[in-house]
Amino acid sequence: AASDVYKRQELFNSSRPREYDGSHIQFTGMTPEITLMPHQKNAVAHILYGNNTLLAHCVGAGKTFQMIAAGMESRRLGLSQKNLYVVPNHLTEQWGSDFLRLYPGANVLVATKKDFEPANRKKFCSRIATGDYDAIIIGHSQFEKIPISQERQERLLREQIDEIAVGIEEMERENGERFTIKRMEATRKSLEARLEKLKADEKKDDVVTFEELGVDRLFIDESHYYKNLFLFTKMRNVGGIAQTEAM
């Protein structure tokens, strides 16, 4: 009997990834001169209903239009109020042009090099925070100049320190490699130093943080540029596991 139950589970119990169908989406405001392909509509549905989404399509599959359409539908449906698109620096103007080609009536704010110069950065970030835009488009390096709040930085650092401390205890209990433990201890000390420096720094009231922008949906073009950032793990010398240390 137990064998029959096992066979039944093998035959009939299974998990299947959810499939997203975007054929019903009307795309209000999109130019009638452009019609999205079925796979593009399905990708938009995935973004709208699937939360975090990776568009791992090949070059030329239309990922730009997918993200643009997803952002506009998200605003129309009330799923987001302020969409931020972070793209390679040399493509900000091209993205702005593509956005208006697909949605001619869209209100789009495109950052220029001057907007993120020290003298202009606060003013531009204030425009993002107070403006009612369908989309804000900025470059990767510009995005990296917008700090997250000190409170969030401290919380993230404390979480990483706690995770590493637990990992060290487990490695010592399991008689793990001393070299690995030393690296973990060095990483913890580095994070603790960052935390102390952060706590010692006076908060700059004239700096607009990411939280203050009001962005509630984020699109990253060419997101592979952000691969292999620091991630705590006890695994070492394993293909695909980032080896970078905490900055």
Regions found by a protein language model. Give the residues of each.
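Short, small-residue-biased leader/transition segments that mark boundaries at the very start
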Residues: 2-6
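Non-transmembrane alpha-helical segments in soluble domains
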Residues: 9, 44-48, 96, 100
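Structured helix-beta-strand junction loops
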Residues: 11, 49-50, 131-132
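Proline-centered turn/helix-capping motifs that create local helix->coil transitions or kinks
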Residues: 12-20, 224, 228-231
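Conserved pre-motif I regulatory segment
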Residues: 15-56
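SF2 helicase/translocase NTPase motor core
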Residues: 24-34, 63-64, 75-219, 225-229, ...
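Well-ordered alpha-helical segments embedded in enzymatic catalytic cores
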Residues: 39-46, 66-70, 123
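Walker A/P-loop
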Residues: 50-71, 82
